[in-house]
Amino acid sequence: MADLIARLREDGIQKRVIQEGRGELPDFQDGTKATFHFRTLHSDNEGSVIDDSRTRGKPMELIVGKKFKLPVWETIVCTMREGEIAQFLCDIKHVVLYPLVAKSLRNIAEGKDPLEGQRHCCGIAQMHEHSSLGHADLDALQQNPQPLIFHIEMLKVESPGTYQQDPWAMTDEEKAKAVPVIHQEGNRLYREGQVKEAAAKYYDAIACLKNLQMKEQPGSPDWIQLDLQITPLLLNYCQCKLVAQEYYEVLDHCSSILNKYDDNVKAYFKRGKAHAAVWNAQEAQADFAKVLELDPALAPVVSRELRALETRIRQKDEEDKARFRGIFSH
């Protein structure tokens, strides 16, 4: 360990172990997954916090050998055991791109595109342009780089092949191969009644395909082929949201499908159910009528939905009348 720390120091990285880890130091071969919490701090006397993964509810995951945009993180985590807590003071040369990486991580935490504002422009060029990153603290750090301290708590180290990669960590080829597998896992979970978990699987599969689709010209044959793969996954996701009673999300997604594919029976049916659930009776009836127009064989199912809607409306009308009678009787 002393030799390791000495080599880090020669490269402009000072390591201070706060809590010893467990077992032997992993070999960290390519494909190893390190899961850790981090805090990024200014290196001045105040040591104020710039970013803290614990405030985002999810630890950082790094795959060794995937050319993470902040190479120093791979360097330092590869010196740590599971359970270890350490601080690393890193020279400017190692952290000049931190503002860009931090922006991406913040976007991910907020559910945004991690590449928002960074397309078609390399990191170094952006640094020279001094374009705003949308965060005052990162803008200041970009314009006046300084050494940074990374406080790392290593939670888990997993060898290649012992874990399922997150979509963001996959190559394009890995994403394409993973989609059918993730799709089937989602179907299995849904059949077993694990609706929330199934929705997460469908979401991951959609994320893989959306990432691939972003690299294609909109409307091109490859783009359309990917979109045709996304649609059934999105419909499955909507089914999960119907069960979870998240009706407005169903309305949004089904409408987006129908804007492109106006003959999609399943999208009309699910949107009709969502409209019915939020008391949009006319819209529900219109969607169910479209279902019958496109597939008359579904008449029994549609009739059942319409009867259920009529019953709910009648009950609601009776409840409203009773409520109004109570108001005016006082």
Curated annotation (Swiss-Prot):
MF annotations from Gene Ontology: aryl hydrocarbon receptor binding; GAF domain binding; peptidyl-prolyl cis-trans isomerase activity; transcription coregulator activity; unfolded protein binding
SUPFAM superfamilies membership: FKBP-like, TPR-like
Tagged with keyword Metal-binding: no
Superkingdom to which the source organism belongs: Eukaryota
Domain PPIase FKBP-type stretches: 31-121
Keywords: Cytoplasm, Phosphoprotein, Repeat, TPR repeat
Main location class: cytoplasm
GO BP, sorted A to Z: protein maturation; protein targeting to mitochondrion; xenobiotic metabolic process
Span of the signal peptide: none
Sites bearing Phosphoserine, chain numbering: 43
Xref: PROSITE patterns: TPR, TPR_REGION
TPR repeats: 179-212, 231-264, 265-298
Cellular component, GO, one term: aryl hydrocarbon receptor complex
Compartment(s) where it occurs, according to its Swiss-Prot or TrEMBL record: Cytoplasm
Self-association state and partner proteins as the record states: Interacts with RET in the pituitary gland; this interaction prevents the formation of the AIP-survivin complex.
Known role: May play a positive role in AHR-mediated (aromatic hydrocarbon receptor) signaling, possibly by influencing its receptivity for ligand and/or its nuclear targeting.
The protein's name in its UniProt record: AH receptor-interacting protein
